[in-house]
């Protein structure tokens, strides 16, 4: 008889392979649930895990069953109202005695939505799937690292989903062979001695009995060697290796003027938090430059960018001028892939909008890989949007999107950073 002893330290992950299969099978429904859930989160809670709900109808398995129509014979418990062969009238729709306030239905059963928890890593992987920085190219000098997963031999620790059955059985065979080799040689010698002794005359019964006992003991010891042990287990090892890719810098330009109310600022912050998570999740050492502006623009750190209360009038060109200065000072376009994301409510001093058009057309768009403008407003577009529309017609690396409310943030983000196909990038 063979005994299997489960000594795995990671027993809680025994269903990992089933979980991964489930995530692959219902990816579309899960991504839909995630896109709806992200809009309900607070600004500071964008990157945690998520409880995902899927309608039961979407995960139900096909099955054969009897139809609702026709005549069928059933056996019911006895009662004091009916006897054998009595006909029971079919109840009218709505004739039930339930306590609910909804409309009656002929369907008497139902199920709640299926709800399960996904981890932070699973959540972010699904959130940013198929997204990439547009027009990213390799430059001549320093590089950032984009990590990709590669096979890297075998390891003695891992999750059950990565176990290598063939390598584990090979180790099991080698261990059992090594542990029982001496006993098997001794067993063969005793069996040969017993065979010789049995054919000799006169019979030596006591000696034969002793040999049989020793043979039985050796066989028992050999059988007690476990078929497989924790020591034998080998898991496929995967490691993340840097995949050379060009270094990049992202400029985040946010309007904090008085016309931007708190709700509009929160939507802008949500967009930039998504952008930051996407960059940090997908690429290593991408530099981010934060610029806040009202009548004056200022380069700030991450904390001040998201939490400063400073406000004022609106001159958008101040942020574009500052970006141009920073690019010339620190980021040579020949060595860097330069990106920018600008968020505003569209309000701007009327005489300043043509200047914004000029700065972008002559100084920034010729050197950046991609420039995205997001206008957050429910009002009609003003001069800044109209000036930028001319730029969109002139430059392929300029994109504009309109956000009206919180539900538009994630779809707009995916639209701006959707991974391009080979034909599109060419």
Curated annotation (Swiss-Prot):
Residues 78-108 are annotated as: Disordered. InterPro entries: UPF0229. Pfam families: DUF444. Residues 78-92 have a biased composition (Basic and acidic residues). Coiled coil: none annotated. Belongs to the UPF0229 family. HAMAP family: UPF0229. This is UPF0229 protein YeaH. It comes from Salmonella arizonae (strain ATCC BAA-731 / CDC346-86 / RSK2980). The gene is yeaH.
